[in-house]
Amino acid sequence: MNKIIEMDFLEISNLIQSGKLQVCVIGIGRIGLPTALSFANSGLHTVGIDINPTLVSNINSGIFPLKDEPGYDTIFENVLKEKKFSATTKIEDIVPSSDVILLSLPTPMDQNNIPIYSALKSVSQQLHDLLTPGSIVIVESTVEPGFVEDELISIIEGSDGRLKAGKNFGIGVCPETANPGQILNDFERLPRLVGATDDKTANIITKIYKHVFTVDLIPMPNCKTANAVKLTTNVFRDINIAFVNELAILFEKIGIDIITVLEAAKTKYNFQVHYPGAGVGGPCLPVNSYQMLNLAKKIDKNLLSIVKAGRIVNESMPQHVINLLTEGFLESGKNIIDSEILILGASYKPDVKDIQLTPAEPIIDKLKMLKCKVKIYDPYFKFTDIFGIKTENNLVDALTNTDAVIIVTAHKEFHDLEPAFLKSRMRTPILVDSRGIVDRYAAKKAGLIFRGIGRGKI
């Protein structure tokens, strides 16, 4: 390997341009795999490391796992063919010969909403034994500010004196900012943040990322500031979604349509529009809010009460969807018990195959408690089981003889649903639109019993 941390910038530039820089990405999931492919596509020999042997085997066999990430399928084919990218489960075979080690590992939370950093800590313990002096570690995983400086570095360094951050290895962060479903587009246009424990490491990371992504690289004074920016952007969104969710519930009660309000409000130049919905899911926003809260309670448990309130609101929205459904059944005169309910969309967001922390799950759990028969149709989850339910493979068949439909995810396929068509297939014509994609007047005209978050009665 090359001792990149000891090189001057001309040597580093030559190393990058020649394609001799050796890169490994530990964790090749939703973000890690596209990241690794981007590095390989830039001409750098890249190895993806993951503990999932099936994923690794499929990748090495040419099976691309992220069908909902446009553009990366072609890149995947090309870098495999050019032998610029491969995958392995054997971290011990790759890390010692790598110049740059990227960490793209999950940071979920436990039942008590405490962030779990066990994957990062476990890998860092391995890095202590495997890292060759002169290399650079880059943390792309989203962590709370201070975690890298206060915990991760000491794990990698250990107590034997072999490794010392800023002396014989570099460590920095470049938090990912991509939106699942459009990762390539985001990687090609969104600025990236770079923070490190020392200026030279920060400059080397900037030079490497500039070669790979050709976007603006924004220097941060340290790792914790870069991580704070990443969390701030996502917590901001979580809080604003909570605000419009509460507005939606208020407006329902006084006959104002939240969608009409928001569409008009966004004509004001400094209004950043957010939309109400069945809840906020995925591996980012809910987790990031709790990461920030976890940090705050170490300082002062009274700080960030607005974030806490936002989480309470957003986590209450699945119950509000059930309340709207119950209203619909009352209007229909039919008992909700033993009724057949179709969930449209299981993913936490439109047009991706991902059910992490999706609001569909608590909605389904509540329906089961009401003794409803639940069906699920999601174009990204056919011929499979999720939440203990075998998914429907055909939308028309799924709709037939249902008593109610709940739109949970605004997949493109659902935007074109005609209310009259829904009415013609259903036994009891109750529609709950939690994403504001159905024209409520068209729904009423078609004879549907319509309820929507923030839509009011018509």
Name every feature range the model reports, one short phrase each.
Residues N2-I458:
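Structural/interface elements that position substrates and couple domains in central-metabolism enzymes
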